[in-house]
């Protein structure tokens, strides 16, 4: 049985940042157990059409504000190549099913209507929470352009997906990662600072890949972790950095069971599914000038192949288009073949650009929802929610601590939220370990009094000595 002071379950950005803080503060015997064959979690690069594409997190959001985004600092430090992204132009590049772009005036009016409706929705939710009735009910989008803008507004720009604090604190600019090393190189660079590496490969025994944790057993004396291949590990504490979707699934079991307040909070947190579908073409047939990186398809079904982006700014000559689907559309596409998805995407593109455009030569469809080690893309707390929900998800249970972007009070759903959450969780654990050390002399004194007032018993003496020594 392998032992450590702290076991960290998951090697995403939260797990890596948590481990780094522990090692830098003297807790060097950490053990990171990762279910897959790589570190990074939902930050994952894959080569497609001769260029690297980001299957999961792809942007550094919140740059240029009064405070410096810590992930932007890492990107600058390690010379990560990025490209500025401006979503705002997308609303003026909205195509109908006949291939015509909606006039600017109509697009502006529809966007204003959608914003006003979102504000009314927020006020209505606030009124419900306070037991009042809203003065005016928000309108629902009905036409294809209204549905498209509603999708863009809520799935890309508003607080239901993006915590406003990201933009208030760190700034409103967003940068697309376009580096051959991938976004994940930031994690490898972080790992190099506390793990043994060689030529970009992590060789340190404290990182164990392909270790699927299935059971976490907690007792007064420590925590035992069991994996799918039968391996058993023991530690004084455990940090669980699995995603909220994994916590909601049956992949991880806890003994004893987590308390009801914990499990109820975990189940109440929404999980967003965000799917970027990549299409490779023999040549470029879409507009590529200034302000045309993003474009929108207006359809009668909300979110149906709505949001498009070309990769020419990031990788000139790549001839790659990306279409983003979310939630139910994502789950629908994950359940069908890539060929069927390509057929649907081509039908949409021919609506916008005509029947003579070339057929895609390749397609890449990530499946975050059906990945049992991820079960979704990121957490999504309700626009109006009790802060107690997040606090309960975040709170430790005995020797088991929890981290991840879903435990970030201000930046849930973001890479920097996960990064900061790992740091915060390790700081809390270090404080817990410090308090435990301070209590040891008192516990030893209490146990010694117990020994002097009880009839000697070999097994009892052994138990007390074992507990006092701190070896259990």
UniProtKB/Swiss-Prot annotation:
Optimum pH is 8.0. It is found in: Cytoplasm. Disruption phenotype: No visible phenotype of seedlings under normal growth conditions. The double mutants pao1 and pao5 exhibit enhanced tolerance to salt and drought stress. Expressed at very low levels in leaves, stems and inflorescences. One of its GO terms (biological process) is spermine catabolic process. Binds 1 FAD per subunit. Flavoenzyme involved in polyamine back-conversion. Catalyzes the oxidation of the secondary amino group of polyamines, such as spermine and its acetyl derivatives. Substrate preference is thermospermine > norspermine > spermine > N(1)-acetylspermine. No activity detected when putrescine, spermidine or N(1)-acetylspermidine are used as substrates. Plays an important role in the regulation of polyamine intracellular concentration. Involved in the production of hydrogen peroxide in response to salt and cold stresses. This is Polyamine oxidase 1. It comes from Arabidopsis thaliana. The lineage of its organism: Eukaryota, Viridiplantae, Streptophyta, Embryophyta, Tracheophyta.
């Amino acid at each position: 049985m392998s032992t450590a002071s702290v076991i960290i379950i998951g090697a995403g950005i939260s797990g890596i940042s948590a481990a780094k803080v522990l090692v830098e503060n003297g807790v060097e015997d950490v053990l990171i157990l990762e279910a897959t064959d790589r570190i990074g979690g939902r930050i994952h690069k894959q080569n497609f059409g001769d260029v690297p594409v980001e299957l999961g997190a792809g942007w550094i959001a919140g740059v240029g504000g009064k405070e410096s985004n810590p992930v932007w600092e890492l990107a600058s430090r390690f010379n990560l190549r990025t490209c500025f992204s401006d979503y705002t132009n997308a609303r003026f590049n909205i195509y109908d099913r006949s291939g015509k772009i909606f006039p600017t005036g109509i697009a502006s009016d529809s966007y204003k209507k959608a914003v006003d409706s979102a504000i009314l929705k927020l006020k209505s939710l606030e009124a419900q929470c306070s037991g009042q009735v809203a003065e005016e009910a928000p309108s629902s989008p009905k036409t294809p352009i209204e549905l498209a803008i509603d999708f863009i507004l809520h799935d890309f720009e508003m607080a239901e997906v993006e915590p406003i604090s990201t933009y208030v604190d760190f700034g409103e600019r967003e940068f697309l990662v376009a580096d051959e090393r991938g976004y994940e190189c930031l994690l490898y660079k972080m790992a190099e600072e506390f793990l043994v590496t060689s030529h970009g490969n992590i060789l340190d025994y404290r990182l164990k890949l392909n270790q699927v944790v299935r059971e976490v057993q907690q007792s007064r004396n420590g925590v035992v972790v069991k994996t799918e291949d039968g391996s058993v590990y023991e530690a004084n504490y455990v940090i669980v950095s699995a995603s909220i979707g994994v916590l909601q699934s049956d992949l991880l079991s806890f003994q004893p069971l987590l308390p009801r307040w914990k499990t109820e909070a975990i189940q109440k947190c929404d999980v967003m599914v965000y799917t970027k579908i990549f299409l490779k073409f023999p040549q470029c047939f879409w507009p590529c000038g200034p302000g045309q990186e993003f474009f929108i398809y207006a359809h009668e079904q909300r979110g149906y192949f709505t949001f498009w982006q070309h990769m020419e700014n990031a990788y000139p000559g790549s001839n790659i288009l990306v279409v983003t689907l979310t939630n139910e559309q994502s789950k629908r596409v994950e359940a069908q073949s890539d060929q069927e998805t390509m057929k649907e995407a081509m039908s949409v593109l021919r609506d916008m650009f005509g029947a003579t455009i070339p057929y895609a030569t390749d397609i890449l469809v990530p499946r975050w929802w059906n990945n049992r080690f991820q079960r979704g893309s990121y957490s999504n707390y309700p626009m109006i929610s009790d802060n107690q929900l997040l606090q309960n998800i975040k709170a430790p249970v005995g020797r088991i601590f929890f981290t991840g972007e879903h435990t970030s009070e201000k930046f849930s759903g973001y890479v920097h939220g996960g990064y900061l959450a790992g740091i915060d969780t390790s700081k809390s654990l270090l404080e817990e370990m410090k308090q435990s050390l301070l209590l040891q002399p008192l516990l030893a004194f209490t146990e010694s009094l117990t020994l002097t007032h009880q009839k000697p018993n070999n097994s009892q003496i052994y138990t007390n000595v074992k507990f006092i020594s701190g070896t259990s």
